[in-house]
């Protein structure tokens, strides 16, 4: 792995570096997108979005915008995470973001629970095919869902802590609703960030209540991190 190769370099530095010739190509974030384009011969926009936990959602919005701007008819978009490593676990543990409920790992990650104390590290990946509506209809494609809008923002607050009032999350949802030309009352489900941390979950709830008002109590809400 990249981490092992870097670690090996510093461990054996006195004997000289032994880098694999593919070290740099494997290191860059957009190599995953590059592999997809090379395998399938795709010549459209090709890059990786790097925005921490929002990367996959941002890639979805980027794909949506490229299609509605006429830059492409079909785009493969998605994301992956493989952070279970010494550096990944050590770093998140130092931030006190990981649950210490080791005796009950199956239910340790419990977003919005009063007894939450952090998340459980996991890995995974997913890709979606986004296609211009008329293009999909013309070829008789099975359409699973329609993307109607997206929003982006930032807390502009702290390196690791979310804004205590959830300002960034509030702006994101407002921007998404505006872009989709939807009213808050038309939303019935939110898949939240839900880190299961004492600070993060509170700010997210505040943001939802601020945007949706009384309708917030009618929403179905869940976090993938609880699964």
Report the location of each language-model feature.
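Conserved beta-ketoacyl condensing-enzyme motif
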Residues: 1-51, 80-89, 184-200
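Solvent-exposed alpha-helices and their adjacent loops that cap or buttress functional pockets
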Residues: 16-17, 29, 40-43, 67-69, ...
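Active-site-proximal alpha-helical scaffold in enzymes
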Residues: 32-40, 45-81, 119-141
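Stable alpha-helical structural segments in soluble proteins, enriched in small hydrophobic residues
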Residues: 59, 172-180, 207, 211
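Condensing-enzyme catalytic core mediating Claisen C-C bond formation in acyl metabolism
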Residues: 103-180, 189
